[in-house]
Every structure is written in C-alpha cells, then in structure tokens.
C-alpha cells in the first residue's frame, strides 16, 4: 500500500525517539480493516527500536474517529473484524513504551476503544467521547475491558449502558482524559519533550513493564471472555443483527427483546 493511499501516516521524529501515527481518512477516520492493519503493521515495525521512547497517535481533520465500520460488524465479517481490532488493542496494551493519544472532535465507538488502549490521553475541552454501540443493539467489547480500570466501574457502566457522549471536560473529571488542552497534539509533544525525551529508553521500558505487569494481563484475560460473549451469544441474538441492519438501512430498529 502506497503512503498516499494508506489510511495511516507513519513517521519518526525527535531523532527516532518518537513514533508518530496519524489516522488519515478524514473526516470520519473510520477504524476499519485497512486502518487496523496499518496500525498493527506500524507498531510491529517500530516498537522494538532501541531508541524509541513513546508513540503519539492523533488524526487528520476535525475528528479523531467516528468509530468502527458498521458494515464489518455484520455476521459475515464480524469475527474477523473483532479479532483484528482486539489484536491491535492487545498490541497497544503490550507496548514497551508509553502511547500518547491526542484527541479532537468526535471520538466514538471503536475510535474510543483504540484511544483508551493508549496510556496518556490529551484532549480538547470540546471533544466528544462515547460508546454508542448499545443504541445499535450491540455492546463495546474492548471498551468493556478498558474503561473500568481507567474511569472506575460506575462511570464505565454509565457510558457503556447509556451510549451517551461526554465532552472533554467531563472526560477529564472522571479520569478518561489525562490532560485538557486547546491543542492536544502540542500538549502531548510538550509532555514528551519535558518528561520523556531525555530519559534512558531502556530504563523507561522497564518502568512501563513494572507499572503494567498486573493490570494488562487482567484486561487481556477479560477481553478473551468478552470477545467470546460477543461472537457466540450476542451475534446469535435477533436484536443485535436487527440493530445493525436498521442502522445501515437508516431506519428505526424493531426490537423483539431476544
């Protein structure tokens, strides 16, 4: 895939110590199979570079991401899509260096799941965050695992069960967002330059392992359980398929509660 046609821009800066990943299909920046594959390839190629100290993920255009491809959630594609997305999430959780994420505009569904797999989230105050999957008759599997340890069980359940969106200010209050800034990319770069750039890259990797050696295995184990629940039970239900079809057909869903 040529750089011009790739859904992801990838480059190194700060003398190879910072890997930049930029979602590059504005304005929606849909997290589809091509986007997931490009992100996994970039991480696989660069994360083990000895001088690397961090990753910064952001997006072109006014919005980070409207979410995953609904077409790819249909029964004939769902298993492949979900396993690929969860593979990306696992690789981000296993990153040996911090992943910083700069967020503007809408960050919804699968877009928020990808962002929440990072370590430090920088966001504009008016950015919007949500997991609207429940309104389509499904649920957000990765977010069900990533949000509770980040924002607490009660706040996570609010977002996961209601499907409502919150702004950056509320996200900061509940712990979803680490830093609020009018220019999240600049804030993330400043944080890197002030706190990470001059550290020993090898010692930083040990610190990352130490901080996450108990939490990451728990999240990954839960993700296995939730993925099976989604694929084997949810997608066998009438209402899950009906909700997705209704969204694609731009009509109201006919819930049968089964």
From Swiss-Prot:
GO MF: cyclohexa-1,5-dienecarbonyl-CoA hydratase activity
Top enzyme category: lyase
GO biological process, one term: fatty acid beta-oxidation
Listed EC numbers: 4.2.1.100
UniProt cross-references to Pfam families, sorted A to Z: ECH_1
Transmembrane segments: none
Pathway participation: Aromatic compound metabolism; benzoyl-CoA degradation
Protein's UniProt keywords contain Electron transport: no
Similarity comment: family membership: Belongs to the enoyl-CoA hydratase/isomerase family.
This protein's name: Cyclohexa-1,5-dienecarbonyl-CoA hydratase
The organism of origin for this protein: Thauera aromatica
Species lineage: Bacteria, Pseudomonadati, Pseudomonadota, Betaproteobacteria, Rhodocyclales
């Amino acid at each position: 895939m040529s750089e011009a046609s790739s859904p992801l821009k990838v480059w190194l800066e700060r003398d190879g110590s910072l890997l930049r990943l930029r979602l590059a299909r504005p304005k929606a920046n849909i997290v589809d199979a091509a986007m997931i594959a490009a992100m996994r390839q970039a991480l696989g190629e660069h994360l083990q570079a000895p001088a690397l100290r961090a990753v910064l993920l952001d997006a072109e255009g006014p919005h980070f991401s409207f979410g995953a491809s609904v077409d790819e959630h249909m029964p004939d594609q769902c298993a492949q899509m979900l396993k690929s997305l969860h593979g990306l999430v696992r690789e981000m959780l296993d990153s040996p260096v911090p992943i910083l994420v700069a967020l503007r505009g809408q960050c919804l569904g699968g877009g928020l799941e990808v962002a929440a797999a990072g370590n430090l989230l920088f966001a504009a105050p008016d950015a919007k965050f949500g997991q609207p999957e429940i309104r389509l008759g499904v649920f957000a599997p990765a977010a069900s695992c990533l949000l509770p340890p980040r924002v607490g069980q009660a706040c996570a359940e609010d977002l996961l069960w209601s499907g409502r969106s919150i702004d950056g200010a509320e996200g900061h209050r509940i712990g979803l967002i680490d830093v609020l800034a009018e220019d999240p990319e600049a804030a993330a770069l400043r944080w890197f330059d002030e706190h990470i750039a001059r550290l020993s890259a090898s010692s930083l990797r040990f610190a990352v392992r130490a901080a996450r050696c108990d939490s990451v295995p728990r999240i990954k184990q839960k993700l296995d359980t939730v993925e099976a629940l989604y694929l084997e039970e949810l997608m066998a239900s009438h209402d899950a398929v009906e909700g997705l079809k209704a969204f694609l057909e731009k009509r109201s869903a006919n819930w049968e509660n089964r």
